[in-house]
Amino acid sequence: MSDDRLSVAIIGSGNIGTDLMIKIMRNSKLLKVGAMVGIDPKSDGLARAQRLGVPTTAEGVDGLLDMPAFRDIKIAFDATSAGAQAIHNQKLQAHGVRVIDLTPAAIGPYVIPVVNFDQHVDAPNINMVTCGGQATIPIVHAVSKVSPVHYAEIVASISSKSAGPGTRANIDEFTETTSKAILEVGGAAQGRAIIILNPAEPPLIMRDTVYCFVSAEANIDAITDSVEQMVKSVQEYVPGYRLKQKVQFEKIVAGNEQNIPGLGWSTGLKVSVFLEVEGAGHYLPSYAGNLDIMTSAGLTVAERIAGSGVQVGGLK
């Protein structure tokens, strides 16, 4: 029987790459893992891939290009680092391979599956922003659909144990990329992103706070409905994504103005949304919702590409 699933490569055998491999192998009807790529021959991810019968290389992207399996690769997930992504992308694009970038490199357009995938379905490189971006930008977008968002601020709190060397090396890129995507994808006029590595034991699941500053006359019921519908949409591919409590509203009145970036001292309406993200526990512990939402979003994008009929590359 023929196997019509799209063959993908995963570059990076750490937490994100390994979780993504297991998600695809367990759940995907449209994709198959054609190669797992690392640089540490002793990594758990490469060892696990070998046990599962996945072709592997510990020679990085150059090793991937030399693999017989590379001829069938149509999409490559990059789960390494922002610095390495530029090199990987150049080499893969030369062979017509679509790249789904799970680093903050932002070479391609920012994509949040529930917000703007359809606009970038044919992009050769798709950037998945960051874990904090995947969790919070849908909420900023949900508010901005109802009322102009003058300023949005997100705070992503993740367990220190879930932050591997790649995450820690990309902290500056995380804040920069997420802040830009709050504007470009979320629709806010101004934005800021903060990440907190929480050392608490036992480890806590990912928690995110989204603040949006809107005009005082904004429709509270419409904002609440829009946010709740967006949460349901994200839950379709991240079941552990949820509101921690009801959407909160605070009227900022004359005499109690707040200093809003880009606006100065202002009155208006402050919208606060509190989220938590529990991981599915495929490879990573359930507290690592920050990694789970990235792999789930990346998988969703790849499956939509596979099911879209858009031509994908690779050597013939």
Swiss-Prot record:
Entry keyword set: Aromatic hydrocarbons catabolism, NAD, Oxidoreductase
Positions annotated as active site in the UniProt record: C131 (acyl-thioester intermediate)
List of residues binding NAD(+): S13, G14, N15, I16, S162, A163, G164, P165, G166, T167, R168, A169, N170, N290
Keyword Repeat belongs to the record: no
GO molecular function: acetaldehyde dehydrogenase (acetylating) activity; NAD binding
Pfam families, per database record: AcetDehyd-dimer, Semialdhyde_dh
Catalyzed reaction equations: acetaldehyde + NAD(+) + CoA = acetyl-CoA + NADH + H(+)
Keyword NAD on entry: yes
InterPro entries hit by this protein: Acetaldehyde_dehydrogenase, Acetylaldehyde_DH_C, NAD(P)-bd_dom_sf, Semialdehyde_DH_NAD-bd
Name of the top EC class for this enzyme: oxidoreductase
One GO BP: catabolic process
Recorded superkingdom: Bacteria
Protein EC: 1.2.1.10
Family under the similarity heading: Belongs to the acetaldehyde dehydrogenase family.
General function of this protein: Catalyzes the conversion of acetaldehyde to acetyl-CoA, using NAD(+) and coenzyme A. Is the final enzyme in the meta-cleavage pathway for the degradation of 2-aminophenol.
Protein name: Acetaldehyde dehydrogenase
Natural source organism: Pseudomonas sp
